[in-house]
């Protein structure tokens, strides 16, 4: 089994509803997402996936949808306020936890046809969540 991994950095803000810790308040992270791709064999170029292809697909999506945006739960009253102000917001069906954002990145990678096997999202250098498909 072969694997390659691409790291992408981005910034986002969020808060968690129905949560009694400090993360219930709006705050931000300098995140790092690590996307691992696997394949039993290499393509005609001798690669699992070209790093440039990952960058073109996933980094472009992150830059367009998540970077420097608030990521909020669909029923968060703050989402409506920010949207009415013309501020960029990305809305999830659930709380925007590191676990949910890792799963989102896994799904987006799959939608782009990449052979993703694992996504890890670091909120901080000492706190991360991983989704394995």
Question: Locations of the language-model features?
Answer:
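Charge-rich, low-complexity N-terminal segments
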Residues: 1-133
